[in-house]
Amino acid sequence: MDHLPIFCQLRDRDCLIVGGGDVAERKARLLLEAGARLTVNALTFIPQFTVWANEGMLTLVEGPFDETLLDSCWLAIAATDDDTVNQRVSEAAESRRIFCNVVDAPKAASFIMPSIIDRSPLMVAVSSGGTSPVLARLLREKLESLLPQHLGQVARYAGQLRARVKKQFATMGERRRFWEKFFVNDRLAQSLANADEKAVNATTEHLFSEPLDHRGEVVLVGAGPGDAGLLTLKGLQQIQQADIVVYDRLVSDDIMNLVRRDADRVFVGKRAGYHCVPQEEINQILLREAQKGKRVVRLKGGDPFIFGRGGEELETLCHAGIPFSVVPGITAASGCSAYSGIPLTHRDYAQSVRLVTGHLKTGGELDWENLAAEKQTLVFYMGLNQAATIQDKLIAFGMQADMPVALVENGTSVKQRVVHGVLTQLGELAQQVESPALIIVGRVVGLRDKLNWFSNH
């Protein structure tokens, strides 16, 4: 971290801007909004500065830079079009241990100005450390679209309720649960935006009187196939609100880096034929932590209801009366095929797609006759160890030996690797691939050479 982000209290504190042009005006607006007692020193001033001075909002000092103006200052900004003057301002401020921003010269400055999203009292600052202001601006614009304009009113109202919340709810867990309900209450937010005091009071009293659930809850979240960008917004919200996250081997490090920092993490790594923690024990972990009143997120690769054993875990919770919900994820079949340039359906080649487990319960058997039918795509999950059997069975039940196949290893990640061939090579190809991997069988695989976009990036 090259810079420490801080928020300065400048109300009624002396600040200096050196410069009287458009850039200086933009900086002055920010300092005035923050309540600073502002002095502006320049040879000439654009008209806006004169307007502000006539309204008593700031003091103008016309003439060359006078470093004695820094003597009482808390903060300074050099915003002239003369690099020599800006350097003098920076050095004079440095000798007085005053933080100084030098416009367009981050290396000469002791602090930089971020892009700001103002939802006072909520403030969001975005900075690229001075290396790419345009990138910081683009990120700010994206965040602006995500944060409702009335969010500041909600935050300000929350501040008025803090003492009451502290008095009514004894533990930190209870207070956090109250605030989580408070901030996601759309009726309250709309009432505040409409200045409907009666509705605000009614909603507030309802929130305080509504009993907090001490049983805890479990949220089953699909993390997607690997690329953190494929995690859903709702999935992101859940992992950032969790008390504890129970996750498996298929959840990428990039996604785990998005988990709330003070949340507990329990690794229960699983892969075909090997369980770091047996499924029954995982079920009991979820149950035990929820019974402690915690918000538990069970984070699974792909989609939890597609070969993720999510249904089994929820049955345990249902039997115990533990509240639960499910956030779907992009399943591996969809993600891996898209990132490999293989459409799962196509008018000319496949009118249906089948998602098939290659890891069966003891004694299990697939409907090979229907799986070998034409005009469909097969996607085998956990099929590496059974690749030779899949090859032999499909051929035995009539699938053409030259049917295209692809194996996608570490799909959607920067480590993605795809090997492809024909059905008679499937068992051999599987020896070249490591888990996690997906097997795709069908004529659509032949489109990969034309549609493969990801490996070209």
From Swiss-Prot:
<feature type="binding site">
    <location>
        <begin position="301"/>
        <end position="303"/>
    </location>
    <ligand>
        <name>S-adenosyl-L-methionine</name>
    </ligand>
</feature>
<dbReference type="InterPro" id="IPR037115">
    <property type="entry name" value="Sirohaem_synt_dimer_dom_sf"/>
</dbReference>
<keyword id="KW-0627">Porphyrin biosynthesis</keyword>
<dbReference type="InterPro" id="IPR014776">
    <property type="entry name" value="4pyrrole_Mease_sub2"/>
</dbReference>
<dbReference type="Pfam" id="PF10414">
    <property type="entry name" value="CysG_dimeriser"/>
</dbReference>
<dbReference type="GO" id="GO:0051266">
    <property type="term" value="F:sirohydrochlorin ferrochelatase activity"/>
</dbReference>
<dbReference type="Pfam" id="PF00590">
    <property type="entry name" value="TP_methylase"/>
</dbReference>
<keyword id="KW-0597">Phosphoprotein</keyword>
<protein>
    <recommendedName>
        <fullName>Siroheme synthase</fullName>
        <ecNumber>2.1.1.107</ecNumber>
        <ecNumber>1.3.1.76</ecNumber>
        <ecNumber>4.99.1.4</ecNumber>
    </recommendedName>
</protein>
<dbReference type="GO" id="GO:0051287">
    <property type="term" value="F:NAD binding"/>
</dbReference>
<keyword id="KW-0489">Methyltransferase</keyword>
<dbReference type="InterPro" id="IPR003043">
    <property type="entry name" value="Uropor_MeTrfase_CS"/>
</dbReference>
<dbReference type="GO" id="GO:0004851">
    <property type="term" value="F:uroporphyrin-III C-methyltransferase activity"/>
</dbReference>
<dbReference type="Pfam" id="PF14824">
    <property type="entry name" value="Sirohm_synth_M"/>
</dbReference>
<dbReference type="InterPro" id="IPR019478">
    <property type="entry name" value="Sirohaem_synthase_dimer_dom"/>
</dbReference>
<feature type="region of interest" description="Precorrin-2 dehydrogenase /sirohydrochlorin ferrochelatase">
    <location>
        <begin position="1"/>
        <end position="204"/>
    </location>
</feature>
<dbReference type="InterPro" id="IPR036291">
    <property type="entry name" value="NAD(P)-bd_dom_sf"/>
</dbReference>
<keyword id="KW-0808">Transferase</keyword>
<comment type="pathway">
    <text>Cofactor biosynthesis; adenosylcobalamin biosynthesis; precorrin-2 from uroporphyrinogen III: step 1/1.</text>
</comment>
<dbReference type="InterPro" id="IPR006367">
    <property type="entry name" value="Sirohaem_synthase_N"/>
</dbReference>
<keyword id="KW-0560">Oxidoreductase</keyword>
<comment type="similarity">
    <text>In the C-terminal section; belongs to the precorrin methyltransferase family.</text>
</comment>
<dbReference type="InterPro" id="IPR050161">
    <property type="entry name" value="Siro_Cobalamin_biosynth"/>
</dbReference>
<dbReference type="InterPro" id="IPR000878">
    <property type="entry name" value="4pyrrol_Mease"/>
</dbReference>
<feature type="binding site">
    <location>
        <begin position="331"/>
        <end position="332"/>
    </location>
    <ligand>
        <name>S-adenosyl-L-methionine</name>
    </ligand>
</feature>
<comment type="pathway">
    <text>Cofactor biosynthesis; adenosylcobalamin biosynthesis; sirohydrochlorin from precorrin-2: step 1/1.</text>
</comment>
<feature type="binding site">
    <location>
        <position position="411"/>
    </location>
    <ligand>
        <name>S-adenosyl-L-methionine</name>
    </ligand>
</feature>
<feature type="active site" description="Proton acceptor">
    <location>
        <position position="248"/>
    </location>
</feature>
<dbReference type="InterPro" id="IPR035996">
    <property type="entry name" value="4pyrrol_Methylase_sf"/>
</dbReference>
<dbReference type="InterPro" id="IPR028281">
    <property type="entry name" value="Sirohaem_synthase_central"/>
</dbReference>
<dbReference type="GO" id="GO:0009236">
    <property type="term" value="P:cobalamin biosynthetic process"/>
</dbReference>
<dbReference type="GO" id="GO:0032259">
    <property type="term" value="P:methylation"/>
</dbReference>
<keyword id="KW-0511">Multifunctional enzyme</keyword>
<dbReference type="Pfam" id="PF13241">
    <property type="entry name" value="NAD_binding_7"/>
</dbReference>
<comment type="similarity">
    <text>In the N-terminal section; belongs to the precorrin-2 dehydrogenase / sirohydrochlorin ferrochelatase family.</text>
</comment>
<feature type="binding site">
    <location>
        <begin position="22"/>
        <end position="23"/>
    </location>
    <ligand>
        <name>NAD(+)</name>
    </ligand>
</feature>
<keyword id="KW-0520">NAD</keyword>
<dbReference type="InterPro" id="IPR014777">
    <property type="entry name" value="4pyrrole_Mease_sub1"/>
</dbReference>
<keyword id="KW-0169">Cobalamin biosynthesis</keyword>
<comment type="function">
    <text>Then it catalyzes the NAD-dependent ring dehydrogenation of precorrin-2 to yield sirohydrochlorin. Finally, it catalyzes the ferrochelation of sirohydrochlorin to yield siroheme.</text>
</comment>
<dbReference type="InterPro" id="IPR012409">
    <property type="entry name" value="Sirohaem_synth"/>
</dbReference>
<feature type="binding site">
    <location>
        <begin position="43"/>
        <end position="44"/>
    </location>
    <ligand>
        <name>NAD(+)</name>
    </ligand>
</feature>
